[in-house]
Amino acid sequence: MKETAQEYKVSAVIPTLLKNWILRVVYATLDHIPPFVWEILHVITDIYFFWVQKLINYVRPHSRVIYYNAIKKLDECDTYQMWCQQASVVDEITGANLWRRNFFSRRYDFNSVIEQYSILENMLREEKYDVVKEKFSTTGPCMLRNFAGIGDKKLFTKSLMGTKLLIEQYLTRILEGLDILNNQTLTPTSFFQRCKLSLGTTALILQGGSLFGLFHLGVIRGLLLQDLMPNIISGSSMGACVASLFGCLSNEQLKQLLTDDNLLNIIKNDVDLLKSCGYGNLEQHLNLGTLIQNLIHHGYSQDVYLFIRFVMKYIVKEKTFEEVYQITGKVFNIVIHPTDKSCPNLLNYVTTPNVLIKSAIECSLGSGVISEDTSLLCKNLENEIEPFLNINKNKQVKFLTPENANNPSITESPYTRLTELFNVNNFIVSLARPYLAPLVVNDLKHEIKTSKYYYYKHYPNMPPINANTVRKTQRSSSQSPIKAGTVEDLEPEPLMSPVPPSSAVNDSAEYIIPELGIPQLNFTEMEPLAFKFKYHLERKLKNIATMEFRHRMEVLDNLGLLCSLIKRLIIDEKTPRSATEIAVVPRMKSLSLTRIIEGQLNNIPYWIKSGERSTWPALALIKTRCAVEFKLDDIIRARRSR
């Protein structure tokens, strides 16, 4: 029996030794490959993709080449204003600009929107501000984030420029009404506070990012520059580090830090910080084998580790959650995964006001990632640093990484706790994983990019209506609850001069829609049946493949068959995942293996720009859902400062 046990131990040790020996050989081989070999491989790869693209353009029809060239220029835009100009060109090519001008859609109740718009317009014109206050607070639906379905994602996937112009003008009227009420001295601050309580709050969730965590910086910059950044933010792992950066600095300081290469220059000037993170001489060539070994065994690329050290040294220092909240007024949360359930899993200025932010970041990253001795620290009444948990429990508590943590129930989820504490009912999720971008079901993907089947050039044949019919229709519509004169004022002006596609010029005459009593371009969302079936079949198959892939990975993880690297790439914490959430995901074009492995310093501005560009297509949806909320925040903040 003893010999059998010894043979079993030997047979179990041999594969492990063989595996370690093979890995050492691979790492040593990669370390000794000259740098010019990698440069030659990069040149060969660039040449290959260049000629492949040339061949594809040669085979495509000329009209398709024009379309793809317009889409390609979107990726070359450096500012949001440039992106909007190019997006308007794409909308003209696809006919989406005409779709925006048409009120009709099955996705929202446009009749209810027109009715509320008409009532609000009349009350503001007649200066009946008491009635407007009632519409905002008690009798009206203006303080609903998704009133009549105007927040449906499908309304934001047709046009790159945004949604229906009717929805945009409706929200503009609400904002104008709030400004007018704010200027009225008889309107108390409590009125705006009740409106805000009814509407709810938005939170930004920064999920993970051990490899692409710097992407979160670009998402924050993109939202800040458009004044769409929520005041509540939550993060785990690398997202906790970025959330701490946001919470400790004012918005103006953040804009300055994330502009140009300011962040990179601060890091470059600290030679001690660079050396402690393994950079040494900036001109020194980094050994590829050593970098891959760090990436696999420690789970963080070198540039991400450098940023974590920078935040701890320059930003959070020895500050606590309450101290930071008193300075900036921002609510930032850090999610941790302790093995002891008596320890809170959501840390902020309410639940753990005296906890050191630095220790919270280390616990969110996980025990043994940054330091072996990971524990929560806090300040006592004498301003001395001591363990947050008692000594006996502190020795036993371990903090798990997000991929190794057991998924809590809905009642124990930190995001449920976030909703309870701060009335959060709208989430923006930043998912720093480019390789999962095609598999994210609730990501905002524009159909003109993911599919070429939706073109708004096919209109039903309707006979033109002469002027007598127009006057007759307008007289009949004047007897309806919605006055014809009011609705005529509602006809939206296009943001750009619409250029109908050539195939629709002869069919795009103006007709009268009896329900509205105003001229409208004669087209709907009805596409040719074959195109529509093909698109929906493709979308359904993709959703099925996504759910099947996620299910299989979770089963393998529960059985313990996934290695640590695969778990780090695929398995993560359960963040809010529903049809109402907005997910911002890096594009697959942003995925660069050489940048991940080498971890060069220029990765920081690269990922900031990549994250900022990824937010641009989602800004229209974010503005629709959050514009009224942010206006109320501004009004309340201004009144309190008086």
UniProtKB/Swiss-Prot annotation:
The active site is at 237 (nucleophile), 403 (proton acceptor). Its EC number is 3.1.1.3. This is Triacylglycerol lipase 3. The gene is TGL3. Coiled coil: none annotated. Loses its lipolytic activity in cells lacking nonpolar lipids. It comes from Saccharomyces cerevisiae (strain ATCC 204508 / S288c). SUPFAM superfamilies: FabD/lysophospholipase-like. Lipid particle-localized triacylglycerol (TAG) lipase. The lipid droplet/particle is a lipid storage compartment which serves as a depot of energy and building blocks for membrane lipid biosynthesis. Involved in the mobilization of the non-polar storage lipids triacylglycerols (TAGs) from lipid particles by hydrolysis of TAGs, releasing and supplying specific fatty acids to the appropriate metabolic pathways. Also catalyzes the acylation of lysophosphatidic acid (LPA). Important for efficient sporulation, but rather through its acyltransferase than lipase activity.
